[in-house]
Regions:
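Glycine-rich phosphate-binding loop of ATP-dependent small-molecule kinases
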Residues: 1-349
Length: 349
């Protein structure tokens, strides 16, 4: 049991998207149950972690690309769970997580995008926004914090901002987690019932819930006016937490596959550096390193090629399959040269 369809195809907002008719308990594109979804997510997480590390390495080497994941949703929709369970599968040093609550006094004194720009992911990193600049056309609209002529102008400002962001090398993924009215009530009640969850509850949650219809209208307009080719919206059913997390994992992974991050080439003479390092090692340490070289490097090659092959399967790219075979040959030739040099260095002792 797995994905029968690329979730990007079934979750992406279309021109005729109707939020009122959206099935918030569904699992579009997936034909399995919860245990299947959790297994697929865990397996895909290994690929996600490898791709994230490549993107991070690319950034360290001077690359300019990054990925921004925007997660929106009403209270209890599962935004925090995405950060913990999805991004928790990758190296935290490559992730920049930012949660946007009520603007501080300083933030409120600036343009609404000021605090967003300050939190954008740096090259090589994945940025995750728990709430975002869309609060300024959702909360500020429904709560009448700013007049209509102000928040209506923001749709266009957001589109221009995201277009420039993409042009600068940041891929933007926008997820709206849509929980049903009944499911939200169940989750809020659980927070009240459990002593260890009460810290998550606020009396204001009920005030927000009382404006459910207004928030649904605001979200519908967000999809209508800010769903663009360069930064599309993916609306995710949120009544099943496992599906929400699995779907977002799949979309992020497939997006990184399409980005094709690569391990950067060394900008120094590897053989020369190896020789200099060997001169600082004892004979026994150098021999131990030589003995471990083949198994260590072969394992790394196999792991990297496995990732490539899994990515190729997702993309269905025959040309990429040939490139993967060629890459294996090049790495194996490099290993042969490495073993030859280290053997010569050891024999020269």
């Amino acid at each position: 049991m797995s994905w029968t369809t690329d979730p990007r195809d079934v979750l992406r907002v279309t021109d005729d998207f109707d939020l009122a008719a959206f099935d918030r308990h569904g699992k579009p594109g997936f034909d399995g149950k919860k245990s299947d979804g959790e297994q697929v997510m865990a397996t895909r997480g290994e690929l996600l972690a490898e791709l994230q590390e490549r993107l991070f390495a690319e950034g360290r080497a001077g690359g300019e690309r990054s990925l921004l994941v925007v997660v929106q949703g009403l209270d209890t929709a599962g935004k925090g769970g995405v950060a913990r369970h999805v991004m928790g599968m990758v190296d935290p040093q490559g992730v920049q997580l930012r949660s946007f609550g009520v603007p501080t006094k300083e933030e409120a004194s600036h343009h609404f995008l000021w605090r967003i720009r300050r939190a954008l992911p740096t090259p090589g990193r994945i940025g995750v926004f728990d709430r975002s600049h869309y609060e300024d056309v959702l909360v500020q609209r429904v709560e009448n914090i700013v007049p209509e002529e102000v928040w209506r102008k923001r749709y266009r400002e957001i589109n221009r901002f995201e277009e420039k962001l993409v042009a600068s090398g940041t891929t933007v993924l926008k997820f709206a987690l849509m929980v049903s009215y009944d499911e939200q009530a169940q989750r809020l009640m659980e927070r009240l019932d459990r002593p260890d969850k009460r810290w998550k509850f606020s009396p204001g949650d009920l005030k927000t819930r009382a404006k459910w219809d207004k928030y649904q209208e605001a979200y519908a307009d967000v999809f209508r006016f800010t769903n663009t080719e360069h930064a599309p919206w993916y609306v995710v059913p949120a009544d099943r937490k496992w599906y929400t997390r699995a779907a977002i994992t799949e979309v992020i992974t497939r997006t990184l596959v399409d980005m094709q991050p690569r391990w950067p080439e060394a900008d120094f003479d590897v053989a020369d550096m190896r020789e200099q390092l060997a001169q600082t090692m004892s004979t026994s340490a150098l021999k131990e390193s030589l003995d471990d070289t083949a198994s260590t490097v072969e394992s790394a090659i196999d792991s990297s090629i496995d990732v490539r092959e899994e990515a190729i399967e997702l993309r269905g790219d025959k040309k990429a399959a040939k490139q993967a075979k060629q890459q294996r040959k090049e790495w194996e030739a490099d290993l042969t040269a490495t073993l030859k040099q280290k053997t010569a260095l050891l024999n020269a002792r």
